[in-house]
Amino acid sequence: MTKQIFRKYVLLFLFTCITLVGGCSGRGTNSSSDGNTYDVDAKGIPKFVAVDYIELGKIYRISKFRSSEGHDYSDDFETCRSMKHYFEPKSNVDWSTTKVFSPVKGTVSKIYQEWAGTQIQIKSKEYPAFYFIIFHINLANPLKVGDLVTAGQQLGTHIGSQTMSDIAVGVSTPRGWKLVSYFDVMSDSVFQGYQARGLSSRDVVIISKEARDSDTLTCDGETFTTSGKLENWVILN
């Protein structure tokens, strides 16, 4: 998918959010009302994800955390940056066959019909302040809020070539909603699969807050109006 085509679908996504579902918050799930919080600054980010959410063998490249790809997706502490990861399948793969799994055992906390497929938000059982937000799924079976899912359970497949798969991880902290990189919460055993595809460290797919702040982006609503100078993508071997 070319960058021009991707931008076109981003604009379609934003238009659909505004006109059909009342807007697309860049903060994902706001979980503070249930009382579960986790202080990542004091305790660090736990590496508890033991199952990858997607068929890695079918993925060509991954956008970096805090990139300027897609649209603004930020939290209570940062703004105007994409604090999630896009996973783009290989060009020789039927994107709609790419399997999507629950990365953790938990409960479906929210579910939305998007302009392309279904968005599912999963509240972790082990760390109930952590939420996993997976976009653009073609569900294998109907799901509803409150349903239990197991780690590794196939949720469905990616919707298709009209857009990329993306995943965000949010944490309800004592000071507000915070987005962290999916790579920060995956176990070493899961990350080994990415190392086998050429990633030397988790930092390769994460733009630090300091680096992003030094290469400031501008936004009009959730639309990026500048792209910055930092590389947005990591291509896998």
Provide a role label for each language-model segment.
Residues 119-122, 149-173:
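Short hydrophobic beta/alpha edge segments that flank linear recognition/processing sites
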Residues 20-23:
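C-terminal motif of bacterial Sec signal peptides marking the signal peptidase cleavage site
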Residues 97, 102-142, 165-168:
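Zn2+-dependent peptidoglycan hydrolase active-site motif and core
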Residues 28-119, 150-151, 201-237:
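Surface-exposed, glycine-biased beta-strand/turn segments
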Residues 2-11:
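Bacterial N-terminal signal peptides that target proteins for export
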Residues 172-215:
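Short peripheral tails and domain-boundary helices/loops at the edges of structured domains
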